[in-house]
């Protein structure tokens, strides 16, 4: 094939241009993302039971729905939480690769079976099924700058004019409103009701009857009488629209003709639909929307669409209303992609300089450089064909590929120049001869490197999704690189290179290059002599090799594991939790302290704080809160002390001084779709039906044990709410029936007075809003207030609650969790500084194994994926090595020669392990990819030597030692050149700082360390391996091998 293109260089150019055009068009169409869809798809079911406590919600809603979620395809795990605000959320997580739309349809179908079994109040509120991630893509804040709007006004405007439009935006999965829209609030006075012999049941019945839309039909409607001349709609009663109209609702007409109106027994106002959440932006009243990404949606496109939608609304905002973005994960995505692109450009420049140093000829250097855009653009075309995106992982693959893809072109150019210098042939003839020598090596290297990376593409789970990005990118680049080296590079060499006089190795050049060539030639002679000496005493070097292998094994076992490195994403969160029973007012004081700390003590780093009272990922309640903290640009906060990890550690230390509250600042996970916080995510499960109390005791025991290991664990905390005092009212049904009181009336009165009852809807400024009936605040603050409420008996007498009920205090949970259909408690935590999540997880497993019988555990979220990736890694290494061996065996038509190549692998691996250990990195997914790259590159250097030595023996009849020494002499320059090019190519990854540097350091460090040792050690050990293997498996002993040599050329 090379000879064909040497004679037809324009044909070669045409192919290269077509590849580049395809890549250019692909770049224009490829989506941009931080990561591909790594997180397994999730579907969330949300329901509400107004006024119900957590236990009631769990028993009547959560379990009913869970028990119907059987037989759904690819379901991985299911978690749920039920809280005392009457809210339930059930999240079903599916295996990676599952179609989220089909999963949603299946869940919806199963939910329909459960719907008739749910309480009427729940059905009335509606049950939603959304395919969205568990974490927020962004938080949009809305503030009033001129003080003309209250927080309730802002919230109502956001709910009425913004929430629905954002919910409809493509890519949005779910929208959480921080606040509530207006509702018609009927605040009942029990004393006035009793005075007029009325009950909440009477109030609700009257509102339903008098606030109704009546469809009254038409005058002259069809079928009309003959000759009808008029047709008109009849408008009768319509829904009420104002507090005055509601005040005039008639409750009762007395015998004397006097009337009792709603305003006589209740205070009526436009108020919040609920008062559970209070939001502030930098200390001033605000409202906002927490936006979650739909499963599989593109974060950058969705965020851009949201901003565009909001920009369209802004001209119509009331005076003083302003949008802020206190939490947005997408700037990090943009800048991290930008940083990797910058790294890619730096790598190309460094590789060019290395090539120029060795080739010392602009034309010769230009030939491998031309290969770079051809291969990179071609790789983009392949990515588009596979449906991939331009993301951090594919770009890392490109950076790793830079060093690999110029290798082939360098090998071609260097060998052509060597042939011209040694034999004095003209460029065209030298290229023909050169390609005959190295064509087999090029194909062999391509096969081996592909063999290393192809198995990655077949692994499952989130780890498999990450592996696939690297695999397809690097294998595509490698395949294109070999094609370019066989098609375009020979054509360029034949047409662009100038003839070199026979025997001219550049020693005669002046200046730096002359000195470099002389020194290199001298070093080559010394190196060849050293190898000759080593080959005379191979035994001691094999012992040294065994020591290296043992050291590698030791380092590998000792290297701590994790899933992905943490990143400074420019935003983080702070969780606030007060003791059980704490009020909203107390929580607000703590949130004010948190906000003040960030805006004063960290003012050089913090841009804004959006504090939300009553909301948290651990549950909702008056004693919970969360603060979304946005940091200034990465360029404005240089230094490790201004990174998010340092800021959160300082903040958590400072917040530990706050009495009566638990406050944690925490960073986001590397992949936000896999959770809300860094560290581990642990589920403690009641496997034996021990009950809530026993499970709580087990959880507290585990937390106490974890606290004894501050050297390994930090911030270990329950992701839930502590049990709180609950006021239990027991209804004596026998007494109630004896008094002639309806149980239904008792339940309605209790729910309406203390929990609030949704009655129906009204029209407010053209929008349908809800009507709620509830006791006025001052009549539901104390336990004794229950005695103010009456129920009408069958004989018309008013019976107080005290006549048929008793009350007591007991403890109960405001938030109940379940995991895979069993009661559970979620525990979050982090590894102590200097320790990995893998080590922390192992310790947690040890501590959990000592818990009482019947208490089990499981990992969820990012920790589940980490366990999965750790279990897959050994299989990945083993399969890759086996496939490499088989490819080499096929290439050399020998079972023995591949051993001389395979034995070099530990020499690269030990370098990767040393580099990671000295830098304090972990055995994460990026390191695993780097390790595989190191395996491939180590084998590549060995192939360059082994291929030449074997050819010299088979074709020129040279002896084993002579052929080996000639091979190492001839291949030293290209090995050093390609290795140095690769090392400097990944150097920008190693020294990267700022956005995305965690991932870049993780990828680059191991590969660079591995390449250094693979090069320095391999050039001495590969000759030893080749000689030892050839002696051990000589032809006469290789009965199972073929007796002929296959000519690769």
Swiss-Prot record:
One of its GO terms (cellular component) is membrane. One of its GO terms (molecular function) is efflux transmembrane transporter activity. Residues 29-336, 386-391, 458-465, 556-871, 919-924, 993-998 are periplasmic. The keyword Cell inner membrane applies. It is a multi-pass membrane protein. The chain crosses the membrane at residues 10-28, 337-356, 366-385, 392-413, 439-457, 466-490, 539-555, 872-888, 899-918, 925-943, 973-992, 999-1018. Keywords: Cell inner membrane, Cell membrane, Membrane, Transmembrane, Transmembrane helix, Transport. Pfam families: ACR_tran. SUPFAM superfamilies: Multidrug efflux transporter AcrB pore domain, PN1, PN2, PC1 and PC2 subdomains, Multidrug efflux transporter AcrB TolC docking domain, DN and DC subdomains, Multidrug efflux transporter AcrB transmembrane domain. GO terms for biological process: alkane transport; bile acid and bile salt transport; enterobactin transport; fatty acid transport; response to antibiotic; response to toxic substance; response to xenobiotic stimulus; xenobiotic detoxification by transmembrane export across the cell outer membrane. The keyword Lipid biosynthesis does not apply. It is found in: Cell inner membrane. Induction: Positively regulated by MarA, Rob and SoxS transcriptional regulators (at protein level). Disruption phenotype: Loss of susceptibility to contact-dependent growth inhibition (CDI); inhibiting cells still contact the target. Residues 1-9, 357-365, 414-438, 491-538, 889-898, 944-972, 1019-1049 are cytoplasmic. AcrA-AcrB-AcrZ-TolC is a drug efflux protein complex with broad substrate specificity that uses the proton motive force to export substrates. Belongs to the resistance-nodulation-cell division (RND) (TC 2.A.6) family. PANTHER family: MULTIDRUG EFFLUX PUMP SUBUNIT ACRB-RELATED (PTHR32063:SF13), PTHR32063. Homotrimer, with large domains that extend into the periplasm, interacts with AcrA and TolC. AcrA may be required to stably link this protein and TolC. Interacts with AcrZ. Part of the AcrA-AcrB-AcrZ-TolC efflux pump. This is Multidrug efflux pump subunit AcrB. It comes from Escherichia coli (strain K12). The lineage of its organism: Bacteria, Pseudomonadati, Pseudomonadota, Gammaproteobacteria, Enterobacterales. The gene is acrB.
């Amino acid at each position: 094939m090379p000879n064909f293109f040497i004679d037809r260089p324009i044909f070669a150019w045409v192919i290269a241009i077509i590849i580049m055009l395809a890549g250019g068009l692909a770049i224009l169409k490829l989506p941009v993302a931080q990561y591909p869809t790594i997180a397994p798809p999730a579907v969330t079911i949300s329901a509400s039971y107004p006024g119900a406590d957590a236990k009631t919600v769990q028993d009547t809603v959560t379990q009913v729905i869970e028990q119907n979620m059987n037989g759904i395809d690819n379901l991985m795990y299911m978690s749920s939480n039920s809280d005392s605000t009457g809210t339930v959320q059930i999240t079903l997580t599916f295996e990676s690769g599952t179609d989220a739309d089909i999963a949603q349809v299946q869940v919806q179908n199963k939910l329909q079976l459960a719907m008739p079994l749910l309480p009427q109040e729940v059905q009335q509120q509606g049950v939603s099924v959304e395919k969205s991630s568990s974490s927020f893509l962004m938080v949009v804040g809305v503030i009033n700058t001129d003080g003309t709007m209250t927080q309730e006004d802002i919230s109502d405007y956001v709910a009425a004019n913004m929430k629905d439009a954002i919910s409809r935006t493509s890519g949005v999965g779910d929208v959480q409103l921080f606040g509530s829209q207006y509702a018609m609030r009927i605040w009942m006075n029990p004393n006035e009701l009793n005075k007029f012999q009325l009950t909440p049941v009477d109030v609700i019945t009257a509102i339903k009857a008098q606030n109704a839309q009546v469809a009254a039909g038409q005058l002259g409607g069809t079928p009309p009488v003959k000759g009808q001349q008029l047709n008109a709609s009849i408008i009768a009663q319509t829904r009420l629209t104002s507090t005055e109209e509601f005040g005039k609702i008639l409750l009762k007409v007395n015998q004397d003709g006097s009337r009792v109106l709603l305003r006589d027994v209740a205070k009526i106002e436009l108020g919040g639909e609920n008062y559970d959440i209070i939001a502030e932006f930098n200390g001033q009243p605000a409202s906002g929307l927490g936006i979650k990404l739909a499963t599989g949606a593109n974060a950058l496109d969705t965020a851009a669409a949201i901003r565009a939608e909001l920009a369209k609304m802004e001209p119509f905002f009331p005076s003083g209303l302003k949008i802020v973005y206190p939490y947005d994960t997408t700037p990090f995505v943009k800048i991290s992609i930008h940083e990797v692109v910058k790294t890619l450009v730096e790598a190309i420049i460094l590789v060019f300089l290395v090539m120029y140093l060795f080739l010392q000829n602009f034309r010769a250097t230009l030939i491998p450089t031309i290969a770079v855009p051809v291969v990179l653009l071609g790789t983009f075309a392949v990515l588009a064909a596979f449906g991939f995106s331009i993301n951090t992982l594919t770009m890392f693959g490109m950076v790793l590929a830079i060093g690999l893809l110029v290798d082939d072109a360098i090998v071609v150019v260097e060998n052509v120049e060597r042939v011209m210098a040694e034999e004095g042939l003209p460029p065209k003839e030298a290229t023909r001869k050169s390609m005959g020598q190295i064509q087999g090596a090029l194909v062999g290297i391509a096969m081996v490197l592909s063999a290393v990376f192809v198995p990655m593409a077949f692994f499952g789970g989130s780890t498999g999704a990450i592996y696939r990005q690297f695999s397809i990118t690097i294998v595509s680049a490698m395949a294109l690189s070999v094609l370019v080296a066989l098609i375009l590079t020979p054509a360029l060499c034949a047409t662009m290179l100038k003839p070199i006089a026979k025997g001219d190795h550049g020693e005669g050049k002046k200046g730096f290059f002359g000195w470099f060539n002389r020194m290199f030639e001298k070093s080559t002679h010394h190196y060849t002599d050293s190898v000759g000496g080593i080959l005379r005493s191979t035994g001691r070097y094999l012992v040294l090799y065994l020591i290296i292998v043992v050291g590698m094994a030791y380092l590998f076992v000792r290297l701590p594991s994790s899933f992905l490195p943490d990143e400074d994403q420019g935003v983080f969160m702070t969780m606030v939790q007060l003791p059980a029973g704490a009020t909203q007012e107390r929580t607000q004081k703590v949130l004010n302290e948190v906000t003040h700390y960030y805006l004063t003590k960290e003012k050089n780093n913090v841009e804004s704080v959006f504090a939300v009272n009553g909301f948290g990922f651990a549950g909702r309640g008056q004693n919970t809160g969360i603060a979304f903290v946005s940091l200034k640009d990465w360029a404005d906060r240089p230094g490790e002390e201004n990174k998010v990890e340092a800021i959160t550690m300082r903040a958590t230390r400072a917040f530990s001084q706050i009495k009566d509250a638990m406050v944690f600042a925490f960073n986001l996970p590397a992949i936000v779709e896999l959770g809300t916080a860094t560290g581990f995510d642990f589920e403690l499960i009641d496997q034996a039906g021990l009950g809530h109390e026993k499970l709580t005791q087990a959880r507290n025991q585990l937390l106490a044990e974890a606290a004894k290991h501050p050297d390994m664990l930090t911030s270990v905390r329950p992701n839930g709410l502590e049990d709180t005092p609950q006021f239990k009212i027991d209804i004596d049904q026998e007494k109630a029936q004896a008094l002639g009181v309806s149980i239904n009336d008792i339940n309605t009165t209790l729910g309406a007075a203390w929990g609030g009852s949704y009655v129906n809807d009204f029209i407010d400024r053209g929008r349908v809003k809800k009507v709620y009936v509830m006791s006025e605040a001052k009549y539901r603050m104390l336990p004794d207030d229950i005695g103010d409420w009456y129920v009408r008996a069958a004989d018309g007498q008013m019976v107080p609650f005290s006549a048929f009920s008793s009350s007591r205090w007991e403890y109960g949970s405001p938030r109940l969790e379940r995991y895979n259909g069993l009661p559970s408690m979620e525990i979050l935590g982090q590894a102590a500084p200097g320790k990995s999540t893998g080590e922390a997880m192992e310790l947690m497993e040890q501590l959990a194994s000592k818990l009482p019988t019947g208490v089990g555990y499981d990992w969820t979220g990012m920790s589940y994926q980490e366990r999965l990736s750790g279990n897959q890694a050994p299989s990945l290494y083993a399969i890759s090595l086996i496939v490499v061996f088989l490819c080499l065996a096929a290439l050399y038509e020998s079972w023995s020669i591949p051993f001389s190549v395979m034995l070099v692998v530990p020499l690269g691996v030990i370098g990767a392990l040393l580099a990671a250990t000295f830098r304090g990195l972990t055995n994460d997914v990026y390191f695993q990819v780097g390790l595989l790259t190191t395996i491939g590159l180590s084998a590549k250097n060995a192939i360059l030597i082994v291929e030449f030595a074997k050819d010299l023996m088979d074709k020129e009849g040279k002896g084993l030692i002579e052929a080996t020494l000639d091979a190492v002499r001839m291949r030293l320059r290209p090995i050093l050149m390609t290795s140095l090019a690769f090392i400097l190519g990944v150097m920008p990854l190693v020294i990267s700082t700022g956005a995305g540097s965690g991932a870049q350091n993780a990828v680059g460090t191991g590969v660079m360390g591995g390449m250094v040792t693979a090069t320095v050690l391999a050039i001495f050990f590969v000759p030893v391996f080749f000689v030892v293997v050839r002696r051990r498996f000589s032809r006469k002993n290789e009965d199972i091998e073929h007796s002929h040599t296959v000519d690769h050329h």
